[in-house]
Amino acid sequence: YDMGLNYIIQGIMYLEKLIELVPAPANPVGNDDSSIVYKKLGIYLPEDYFNFLHVYGAGMFGNSLEVFSPFIKNPYMNFFNQIVILRDSYNSMKQLWIGLNLSSVFPTGSGYPFDFYPAEGGLIPWGCIEGCGTFFYWKPNYSGWEIVAYNDDEYQVFQMSMTEFIYNVFSSNIDFAGLSEITKKDLCFTTCQ
């Protein structure tokens, strides 16, 4: 899973495929200054995320899949706000999971084995499915940015970019319980302020 030129090209390719599937808004809401994010987090996020925000802006697909943005004030969709909220929630669940020794009871693919940003290699949230407990994170590692999808305490790791993941969700190429709410009616994008 190469983070170099191949990763960037694939991100662009899947963004173009996504635009064919779900047309982008004429006037996306947001800002193109990715340096704001680096200054605040101290890390560079995947380029396809900023390409997505440039084309689509802040908003959601249908009434379901939301993509957080650092460039809007809406607290429910603001990227920085969601980092704090989801970090606190995730870490609380992780401590409960460890305290009750639930990893010995539940199968692999359940629980909270990851650290959360700002820990090195910690999860960074980028989106969710509205109202159903499904969240999407990046997991940075030495070989690339993986996607970790969580539905309550069950998770799955996908080795693909964010735009590839979203495209595959809407193309029904990903089998994950938390995505069962996605339907053809969600093949539209609504901008948010």
Task: Label every model-predicted segment.
Residues 130-133, 153-155:
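Glycine-centered tight beta-turn/hairpin loop motif at sheet-sheet or coil-to-beta transitions
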Residues 178-179, 187:
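Charged phosphate-binding loop/patch that engages nucleotide di/tri-phosphates or the phosphate backbone
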Residues 187-193:
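Charge-dense, low-complexity intrinsically disordered regions
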